[in-house]
Design a protein with these regions (language model features):
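Sec-dependent N-terminal signal peptides of Gram-positive bacterial secreted proteins and lipoproteins
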Residues: 1-11
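Short, non-transmembrane alpha-helical segments in secretory-pathway proteins
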Residues: 10-37, 86-98
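A generic structural signal for short, solvent-exposed coil/turn residues
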Residues: 27, 44, 56, 127-129
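Exposed beta-strand-loop-beta-strand "reactive/processing" segments of non-cytosolic proteins
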Residues: 32-66
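Charge-dense, low-complexity polyampholytic segments
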Residues: 64-76
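Metal-dependent nuclease catalytic core centered on acidic motifs
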Residues: 73, 78-189, 212-216, 220-228
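Long C-terminal interaction/binding lobes of large macromolecular proteins
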Residues: 188-210, 228
Length: 228
């Protein structure tokens, strides 16, 4: 496989590597993928990277790394699909919040060799027990009291006993939150731009330990002040 990726002059052939990446992803998942960018091989690395998305899920762009020798691909597609399901569950858990919210979830150490995008949270954690999740919640605060919010936010990780990580809380206008949504849903990862966009919206970060959010009304009040 590797030899075919080098042209007659001994140079790496980007076009062939893009095709190899697309084929590797399709064989791994049984889905069709589009490669949007070839990033090449960084100095000293034994793999190259591409930007890609599944045709069935263009809203989930990701970065895939393909081993130069074996052609094996490692990527966060399974993790990102799982994060989407976690976000949906969180929205249901805190549905009693009266204000409009936006939730998205990201994972640390998200790139895997796992092949089932529909894997359950429990099975995922058996395979990737060190994974920690960041659940970002943006609130367009209008009517909810701090007590109501604190009570509901305690339910964020209900149903995810082994979930560890953090709840990151923000508040903003509808326009600000929509801007964040567009950014989060169009980038492989959160970069410096995300920090800049959310600096003025950020309220605080609260630990999640084995599915329990460590948050009190007092802590929420102290961090949020009069912004909630």
């Amino acid at each position: 496989m590797a030899a075919a990726l080098i042209d007659l002059n001994g140079c790496i052939n980007p076009a062939l590597q893009k095709k190899q990446a697309e084929k590797a992803l399709e064989e791994k998942y049984g889905e069709s993928f589009q490669i949007t960018n070839y990033n090449g091989v960084a100095f000293g690395d034994d793999y190259y990277t591409v930007n890609a998305y599944a045709e069935a899920h263009p809203e989930i762009p990701f970065l895939a790394a393909v081993d130069l020798k074996s052609g094996v691909v490692s990527d966060p597609y399974v993790t990102k699909r799982l994060c989407g399901r976690i976000s949906d569950k969180v929205i249901g858990n805190i549905a009693a919040i009266k204000d409009d919210i936006y939730v998205f979830t990201e994972a640390v150490l998200d790139s895997t060799l796992l092949t089932d995008p529909d894997i359950s949270f429990e099975d995922y954690m058996q395979e990737m027990p060190e994974t920690k999740f960041y659940i970002h919640i943006f609130i367009n605060h209008q009517t909810s009291t701090k007590k109501e919010l604190a009570n509901e936010l305690l339910k964020v990780a209900n149903g995810f006993y082994k979930l560890n990580g953090s709840l990151c809380l923000y508040t903003g206008t509808e326009e600000q939150i929509n801007n964040v949504r567009e950014y989060a849903e169009s980038n492989n990862e959160l970069y410096h731009e995300f920090q800049t966009m959310t600096d003025d919206l950020y309220i605080g970060t609260y630990k999640i330990v084995n599915g329990k959010v460590l948050l009190t009304e007092y802590e929420l009040t102290e961090m949020a002040g009069d912004r909630l």
